[in-house]
């Protein structure tokens, strides 16, 4: 069976007696390459796809190369299309990214799998875990994510649970996944099952791709985990042994390209997923239990600014934000939660005009304490609210959500200081901080 091939490519491969898994050679005056014949997902009927010795897949147009059959390969085992699935249902909601995408090799473009059948074909192991359904909500780069898209994702998650899903997997690009995780955590509470955000650091055509393992472990997590909260599930180390489920309001992408880039900050992961053993190992008992009756409040005010203080930053930036109609500022201050003393009057004016101003730390690890030094105490007198160990991005999203619920400044302050879904960790331990080796 020559899956996906048609037209000129199908005609040529059929004439050679080639099948998926056979070793072919393509050549012309400039190049000679051999590789294993792979299924095609190309729209160009002249393209054949080979997996090269380096592990990468490449497409070749039969209009530009000659093709010969070098040896017959091992036939891939066919999986039944009509097998009895295990009880339980997991909904996969795709928003973009490479996690459930296929590569069109003639252009290099990546397109999402567009149906449940395509996702199962992409990662057939998920059939062994549970029955799934899939929805392509939209397909965007994660840097193009906006609060209005968070609303659509939240509504889709609520709809999935209303339709009987036991857990939901949200496929998402990795760059802004932690923002979306926080947005879902605040806007959908009392969850009846896990909401698992998952992405891929390496595209599916690369030999080191993490997409298959991440998706398999996320489906397993969505079905088996006892908690009812939003988590991010990604590789737990650089090898392929396990993934870690991080609480959605305590996680951050800490490396540009490593497969284990996502780390819990000031917190421990909730669970470890041993995907080969099909086992979910719960690491803590303080998780939010599954609940009945989802509470959906997906309203966000995006006139909120994340202000990173640096030496020389002028306080008139606060007045610019005030005159531009912003309703809140999250400050990413230095150390225990500081800016220069120049900002005291500017923040006082902002608070007087009804803006919420909250303080987080650039250090990420540890918590804000604005009572230690005079600068912090004076900033508090100006109306700046210390936000403990909340991550700057999480504080930003929470303030967007809080302002979407109420315009009363005191109520916003109450919401921001209330530990709703584990965004504050009241107890820190030594092993919350990564100690780098220098030997």
UniProtKB/Swiss-Prot annotation:
CDD domains: GatD
Functional summary from the UniProt entry: Allows the formation of correctly charged Gln-tRNA(Gln) through the transamidation of misacylated Glu-tRNA(Gln) in organisms which lack glutaminyl-tRNA synthetase. The reaction takes place in the presence of glutamine and ATP through an activated gamma-phospho-Glu-tRNA(Gln). The GatDE system is specific for glutamate and does not act on aspartate.
EC assignment: 6.3.5.-
Subunit architecture: Heterodimer of GatD and GatE.
Domain Asparaginase/glutaminase, first and last residues per copy: 88-419
Record's protein name: Glutamyl-tRNA(Gln) amidotransferase subunit D
Gene Ontology MF term list: asparaginase activity; ATP binding; glutaminyl-tRNA synthase (glutamine-hydrolyzing) activity
Enzyme class: ligase
Organism: Metallosphaera sedula (strain ATCC 51363 / DSM 5348 / JCM 9185 / NBRC 15509 / TH2)
Active-site positions on this chain: 98, 174-175, 253
């Amino acid at each position: 069976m020559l899956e996906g091939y048609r037209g000129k490519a199908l005609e040529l491969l059929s004439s050679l007696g080639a099948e998926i898994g056979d070793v072919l050679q393509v050549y012309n005056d400039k190049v000679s390459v051999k590789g294993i014949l792979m299924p095609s997902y190309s729209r160009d009927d002249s393209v054949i796809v080979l997996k090269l010795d380096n592990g990468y897949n490449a497409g070749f147009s039969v209009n530009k190369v000659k093709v010969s059959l070098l040896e017959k390969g091992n036939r891939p085992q066919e999986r039944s299309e009509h097998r009895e699935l295990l009880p339980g249902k997991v909904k996969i909601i795709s928003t973009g990214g490479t996690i459930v995408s296929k590569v069109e090799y003639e252009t290099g473009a990546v397109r999402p799998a567009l149906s449940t059948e395509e996702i199962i074909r992409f990662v057939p192991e998920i059939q062994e875990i549970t029955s799934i359904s899939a929805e392509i909500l939209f397909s965007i780069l994660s840097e193009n994510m906006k609060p209005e898209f968070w609303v659509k994702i939240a509504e889709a998650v609520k709809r999935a649970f209303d339709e009987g899903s036991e857990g939901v997997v949200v496929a998402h690009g990795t760059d802004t996944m932690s923002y979306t995780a926080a947005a879902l955590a605040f806007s959908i509470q009392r969850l009846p099952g896990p909401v698992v955000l998952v992405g891929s650091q390496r595209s599916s055509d690369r030999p080191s791709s993490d997409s298959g393992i991440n998706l398999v472990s996320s489906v397993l997590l969505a079905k088996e985990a006892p908690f009812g909260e939003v988590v991010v599930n990604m590789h737990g180390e650089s090898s392929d042994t396990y993934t870690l489920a991080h609480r959605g309001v305590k996680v951050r992408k800490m490396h540009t390209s490593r497969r284990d880039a996502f780390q819990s900050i000031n917190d421990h992961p909730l669970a470890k997923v041993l995907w080969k053993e099909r086992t979910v190992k719960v690491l803590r008992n303080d998780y939010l239990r599954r609940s009945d009756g989802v509470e959906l409040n997906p309203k966000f005010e995006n006139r909120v600014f994340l202000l990173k203080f640096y030496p020389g930053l002028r306080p008139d930036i606060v007045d610019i934000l005030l005159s531009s109609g912003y309703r809140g500022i999250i400050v990413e201050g230095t150390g225990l939660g500081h800016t220069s003393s120049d900002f005291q009057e500017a923040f006082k004016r902002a608070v007087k005009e009804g803006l919420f101003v909250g303080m987080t730390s650039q250090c990420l690890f540890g918590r804000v304490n604005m009572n230690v030094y005079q600068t912090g105490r004076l900033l508090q007198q100006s109306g700046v609210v210390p936000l403990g160990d909340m991550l700057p991005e999480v504080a930003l999203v929470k303030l967007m959500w809080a302002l979407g619920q109420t315009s009363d400044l005191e109520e916003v302050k109450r919401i921001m200081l209330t530990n709703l879904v584990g965004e504050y960790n009241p107890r820190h331990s030594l092993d919350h901080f990564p100690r780098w080796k220098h030997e």
